[in-house]
Structure formats: C-alpha cells, structure tokens
C-alpha cells in the first residue's frame, strides 16, 4: 500500500499535470470505487469544475476544486494514475475510471485489485465526516505532546500503534519497520511503556525517513509507481524491511521476519532488544 512518501509524490506529480485543468467528462468503469453516490452524480459534481490544487492528509489524496468542491482519492493497495496530453493510442489494463479535461488531456485511474476509493465532499465538511474525520496529522505536522499523550494511553504494541491512522497518519508497514529500527525499538514493545525520550526519537526518525523517501520518489516495492509508471528509489535504502536473512548494517546480526498482528514485520534481534526500549 502506498504510504505517506508515495502519496506525497503522486500529489506533486498530479499538481504538475492537472492543476488548473477543467473536468469535461468522467467515465466510471467500476462504480464500486465511487462511494455513497450514484456514478452519474459523481460525473455531474465534477464536470465544469477546475482543479485548484491537490494535497493530502496522510494517505488520502485531496483534490480542491472550484465552487468549494472536494474529491477524495485513496489508492489502497495499488491504485495508480496515468496522465496523457491527448487520447492515448492504447490504454493500460485495469482502468477503473478516466477523467477527461477540456484541453483534451486525460487522467486514468487503474488498479488490478480494485480496492481504491473516491468520495465527493464540500470544503465546509470534508474534515468533519468520514473518511477523513478521524485521520490524524502526519509525523511532520503533529506536535510532540499530542503524539506522546496518544502513545502513553495505548497498551498496544508500538508497531500496530504507528499504523493506526487516528494516532498519526501516513505510516504503513514499510516505514513502521524502518522507523522502529532507526529508534532501536522492538515492534512488540507496549506503546505506553516508552519514555518521552524514546517517543521523541520515534518522531524524529519518522520525519527524517519519510522526508528522505519523499525526496527519492518513495519505495517501489511490489507494484508502487507514481504518475505514468515512474518508480521510486527509496527501496534501495531500506535497512530492515524485506531484508529477512540479510546482515544488519549496524551489528551484522541477521534480520528476522515475524508475523505480528497480521503484518509481516522485519527487525534486528540484536539492535532491537525489548529490554533496551523502556
């Protein structure tokens, strides 16, 4: 699933291509992705509106449109966008929707496993109702005391706590492993047993890792691509995630993988000993 860096990269690429373009037509091939309303209403809602800017809240892509309209997009497991200046001679597989613009360009949304979602909202309510109502700020936005207080109330292990988008947004399986390795924290450590210094370390490392990944275009693991099939490079700098059996860059112990709370979790058993965390 694309995480914060990947979504940021997609938003940047979309802004470069579709900002200030006006919707002319919308073709919806998979109505299940377009939530709450009939596809015809989605089309009516969008046609004639200009895209003012594209931003994100955590893993959610936010299209800000004229007339105080909002379109939300979540890529879920492997959603992807492709932009064309003019109608392509051939379309890629698994197209779920096509957005046509008045200047003749097209934005295609594709997904081989269609779990992505689209919602339409208005500026005055999009943060007050689902799917964004409970989404927290990202590590670079949240203040330390808020983050610490949320963790101090959670007896749950730190790995699934970091994945909870109501605690802090944008962190998924890849970056949770990397952040905990950088912080020398075992993924099973109860969140409420972490000292303030350790929580500060988590937040600092989260910001640094997510920012660096964003600079490098995200991590192209499995199927991630940003706009027009462009791959990221941060996967070449991962320290533990996907590194089972490889030697730790810090201590030369072998990286282990466990199934934890339903997630494949990578860590160094030497650098991330539980007794060192509290």
UniProtKB/Swiss-Prot annotation:
The cofactors it requires, by name, are:
Zn(2+)
Quote the record's cofactor note. Binds 1 zinc ion per subunit.
Q: Where DNA is bound, by residue?
A: 94, 113, 154
Might you give the EC number(s) for this enzyme?
Answer: 3.2.2.23, 4.2.99.18
Signal peptide residues on this chain, from the entry's feature table: none
Keyword DNA damage in the entry? The reply is: yes
Drop me one GO molecular function for this one: class I DNA-(apurinic or apyrimidinic site) endonuclease activity
Q: Which residues form the active site?
A: 2-3, 59, 263
Which key words are in the record?
Answer: DNA damage, DNA repair, DNA-binding, Glycosidase, Hydrolase, Lyase, Metal-binding, Multifunctional enzyme, Zinc, Zinc-finger
Superkingdom per UniProt = Bacteria
Q: Where are the zinc fingers (FPG-type)?
A: 239-273
Quickly give the catalysed reaction.
Answer: Hydrolysis of DNA containing ring-opened 7-methylguanine residues, releasing 2,6-diamino-4-hydroxy-5-(N-methyl)formamidopyrimidine; 2'-deoxyribonucleotide-(2'-deoxyribose 5'-phosphate)-2'-deoxyribonucleotide-DNA = a 3'-end 2'-deoxyribonucleotide-(2,3-dehydro-2,3-deoxyribose 5'-phosphate)-DNA + a 5'-end 5'-phospho-2'-deoxyribonucleoside-DNA + H(+)
Which PANTHER family does this entry report, sorted A to Z?
A: FORMAMIDOPYRIMIDINE-DNA GLYCOSYLASE (PTHR22993:SF9)
Biological role: Involved in base excision repair of DNA damaged by oxidation or by mutagenic agents. Acts as a DNA glycosylase that recognizes and removes damaged bases. Has a preference for oxidized purines, such as 7,8-dihydro-8-oxoguanine (8-oxoG). Has AP (apurinic/apyrimidinic) lyase activity and introduces nicks in the DNA strand. Cleaves the DNA backbone by beta-delta elimination to generate a single-strand break at the site of the removed base with both 3'- and 5'-phosphates.
Recorded family membership: Belongs to the FPG family.
Which protein, by its recorded name, is this? Formamidopyrimidine-DNA glycosylase
This chain's source organism reads: Mycoplasmopsis pulmonis (strain UAB CTIP)
């Amino acid at each position: 699933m694309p995480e914060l860096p990947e979504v940021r990269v997609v938003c940047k690429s979309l802004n470069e291509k579709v900002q200030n373009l006006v919707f002319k037509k919308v073709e919806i091939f998979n109505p299940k992705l377009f939530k709450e309303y009939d596809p015809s209403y989605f089309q009516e809602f969008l046609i004639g509106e200009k895209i003012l800017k594209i931003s994100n809240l955590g893993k959610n892509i936010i299209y800000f449109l004229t007339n105080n309209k909002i379109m939300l997009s979540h890529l879920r497991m492997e959603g992807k966008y492709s932009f064309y200046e003019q109608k392509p001679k051939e379309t890629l597989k698994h197209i779920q929707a096509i957005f046509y613009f008045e200047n003749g360009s097209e934005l295609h949304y594709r997904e081989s496993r269609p779990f992505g979602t689209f919602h339409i909202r208005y500026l005055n309510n999009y943060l007050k109702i689902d799917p964004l109502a409970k989404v927290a700020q990202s590590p670079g936005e949240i203040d330390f005391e808020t983050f610490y207080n949320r963790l101090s109330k959670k007896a749950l292990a730190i790995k699934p706590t970091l994945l909870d988008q109501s605690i802090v947004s944008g962190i998924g399986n890849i970056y949770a492993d990397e952040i905990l390795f950088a912080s020398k924290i075992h993924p099973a450590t109860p969140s409420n047993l972490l000292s303030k210094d350790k929580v500060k370390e988590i937040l600092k490392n989260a910001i640094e890792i997510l920012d660096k990944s964003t600079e490098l275009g995200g991590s192209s693991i499995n199927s991630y691509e940003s706009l027009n099939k462009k791959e990221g490079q941060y996967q070449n700098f991962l320290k533990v995630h996907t590194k089972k059996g490889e030697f730790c860059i810090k201590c030369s112990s072998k990286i282990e993988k466990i199934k934890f709370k339903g997630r494949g979790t990578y860590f160094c058993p030497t650098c991330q000993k539980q007794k060192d965390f509290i």
